[in-house]
Amino acid sequence: MRLSRIAVAASLAFAASAFAQDKQMSFFVTSAGPGKGADLGGVKGADQHCQVLAKAAGVGNRTWRAYLSESPSTNARDRIGKGPWTNAKGVVVAKNVEDLHQNPNINKQTALTEKGEQVNGRGDTPNMHDVLTGSTPEGRALPADKDMTCGNWTKSGDGSAMVGHHDRTGLNESAEAKSWNSSHPSKGCSQDALKGTGGNGYFYCFAAN
């Protein structure tokens, strides 16, 4: 009986520790998209999706923002607060906005979902390393004459969206292939098109407060 109580106490202590750690989470990759490809209901719809996933993970008390740019002048970097940001395991991925865009600690091991799980990367089946951003490497909106946001996140058919590689791995050693937020345009905006180029309609979520 005594050993049983000790085991239960240890289990509860471990659970409490894990919960406390998760309560500090301020960054994650969505574990699922809304299911309509790059049609996220605009950035507001994407923000709401972040909020729903965060609430399910026990951190819904924070204000969550999707790391997405919109044409012509909504910059992802300006939407996400000041940092620092930590993943579900308590690892700091960036100290502030400048750190995030100059020396981020984002890779397959740290770009975890709100559940604390790794996302499939290059070499995994299926590959899901394409993450929607619609952004330049500096986290800014792309030129308005180039629709790289699938109609500002309202299209699920023709079009294109800029994506990054959460695993920092691509076909070669170029800066683009290793970029977490600005690797290449998708071949379309539908769920199937995103899957066809190594994605699944996922995006980054940051706590803005």
Model regions: which residues?
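Secreted/extracellular ectodomain signature
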Residues: 20-209
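Short, linear, compositionally biased motifs with a strong N-terminal bias
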Residues: 10-13
